[in-house]
Amino acid sequence: MSDTNVFSDVEILALTGVGESESLGEKGMQQTINTVMNRAAADVDWMGGSDVRTVCLQPGQYDCWNPGNDRDRIISIGTSKPDYQPYVTALGLAESAVAGSLPDITNGAVS
């Protein structure tokens, strides 16, 4: 079983926001989450297709999921630090994105 199987699609999306853009604050995490949603909407194989989870975990796309980068840290946040404020913020953004109510502040960007 993959170490990411314990997470829902929303959690994977939120952790991607944290892993890629935590240092940029809420706006940066929203931009990352927007790009994931835009890639899923584009449904391009090399970007992971139309599934949010697959887009996030597609090898070579979001560096935080690549082995040797931030992967262990973000998995740890998801499994043992549910109250970590950037993660809480990203979860709210991810829930809104999946519900279709998060504004796209990237103007359709995929990167």
What spans do the regions from the language model cover?
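Bacterial extracytoplasmic/cell-wall-associated proteins, especially those involved in peptidoglycan
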Residues: 2-111
